[in-house]
Amino acid sequence: MEYEYISLAREDEFAVVTMRRPERRNALSEAHLRELLHAFETIGAGPARGAILAAEGSVFSAGHDFADMHGRRLDEMRRLLLLCAELMQTIQAIAQPVIAQVAGLATAAGCQLVATCDLAVAGESSRFQVPGGRGGWFCTTPGVALARAVSRKHAFEMLATGDPIDAATALAWGLVNRVVADADVERETRALLGRATRGSVSSKALGKQSFYRQIDLDVPAAYAYATEVMAAASQTEDAQENLRAFLEKRPPRFSKP
């Protein structure tokens, strides 16, 4: 697929997706969303150990492109929103950890992207907002990701007021993992992703899958599911190698992906 609004590159063991529409504040048109979906599907099918979602310009993403939305019929609007939902679910479904590298403003579906990514690093000047609540179109779909990334009351505050929050608040509320000087965002993003992708690739993939599957279950069901997954995983070669290496006091030698 030829990309017009994004780029997909490889940096060592990481895949890097960069939104490249700064003149439109990286607004998410249907074509832009399709490119992002294709990129993450490609990453999921490939050998990269982790993925970075970054953006050019001073705005990470302004959310949906209203020029692309205006005048759409109900069926056309539904198709667009379902495409966006498919992208968000794909980011969490692929085996690799995905980290958002945020420098600037992330609003509406742009904030939804940050909330969806497994990890996020933000620059000190970054801001996060779901502004629909103070206008005429509530940010219902961004709320799905937001409510699963921060507390219920913090999510509803953002959704209902539409007020922006700064990077320090985003960190305190759990929307991002790290806040660093703007000049250090790229470095810290790669450092955190490096730590999040070390160890067995297959174990990490299973861990990510089971994390998202159990998180919305009630506690007994979550323990039942997690117990079965962990018990079965104990029989894999990488798990056995981990045990042997610990007992033999040596570094583990995990299988290659």
What kind of feature is each model-predicted range?
Residues V17, L53, D65, L113-A115, ...:
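Hydrophobic/aromatic residues within transmembrane alpha-helices
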Residues M158-L159, S210-Q214, E228-S234:
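Helix-loop "lid/cap" segments that line or gate small-molecule binding pockets
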Residues M1-Y3, R244-P257:
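Terminal low-complexity tails and localization/encapsulation signals of metabolic enzymes
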Residues S7, Q89-K204, T236, E241, ...:
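Crotonase-fold acyl-CoA enzyme core
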Residues G71-L83:
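A short acidic, glycine-rich active-site loop
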Residues E11-R20, A31-R72, T90-Q101, L119, ...:
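A structural preference for short, pocket-lining loop segments at secondary-structure junctions
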Residues H32-E35, L80-L83, V185, A226:
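Hydrophobic alpha-helical membrane-association signature
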